[in-house]
Each structure stands twice: as structure tokens, then as C-alpha cells.
Amino acid sequence: MSREPREVVEDFFDRMEDDDRRPTIGELFAEDAVITVPGTRFEGPDAPEEMLDFFGPPRYEWAAKEFDRWITTGPHVVSLGTLYGVDAAGEEFDDIRYVDVYEVREGLIRRLDIYNDFAAEGVVE
């Protein structure tokens, strides 16, 4: 039996917060996964790695999430909260809103839609 959708998403977040485990996030995604971020889209087996490259330097030095709440309905999991970290110029930022929407089927993330206020708050251009 596959894991519940929220368990898979929480595993994803745990791995993203751990430098040693971050490269293993691909194990949590379906081969035909689709990841969308404002302005770009990643598809297929390389989507998780491409997403990691997209969000790494020089976009910003680092960022982390502070969770506010989870909404789960069937295969869909929504995570809401704020982001904090250090931008590409070395300036700290915090309280940047985000919403991540996941579709998890058969224990794998099939779709991830990422929304945040980085551009609106001037963290990235």
C-alpha cells in the first residue's frame, strides 16, 4: 500500500531541508511529473533536479519555509506559509508568502505548482 499524500509531501519537505538528503527528492516524483513555477515549467524524470537547479544560486543564496497550515483533500495537498533566507545580494528576507499545491498518486508526486511572492517583494527579478 502506498503512503498517504501528506506523508509523501512531508517527506519531500524533510529532504529539502536536509543538504545531504536534498538530492534524493527525485525518488518521490513520478517519471512523468510536472512542476510549475511562475515563468517556467519542468517535466519528466529530470523535473526535480531541474527545479533544484532553478531555485539554487545565483537566484538566491538560500531559502527555507515556515509552515502555516496544510490542506489535504484526496490526492491533493496544499502547503501555505512563508519563506525566509538570504537573497543573491546577501540581504536577508523573511515573511515572503508561498502556496505549494501537490497532486500525489500511488505514493508519488505527479504535479507540483509553486506560487510565491519573491518577485513582488523584490527578492528576485
Model-derived segments and their meaning:
Residues 1-31, 123-125:
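Short, low-complexity N-terminal intrinsically disordered segments enriched in polar/charged residues
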Residues 63-65, 93-99:
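Short, surface-exposed coil-to-beta transition loops
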Residues 83-85, 104:
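Hydrophobic beta-strand positions in extracellular immunoglobulin-like domains
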Residues 73-83:
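A short hydrophobic beta-strand element
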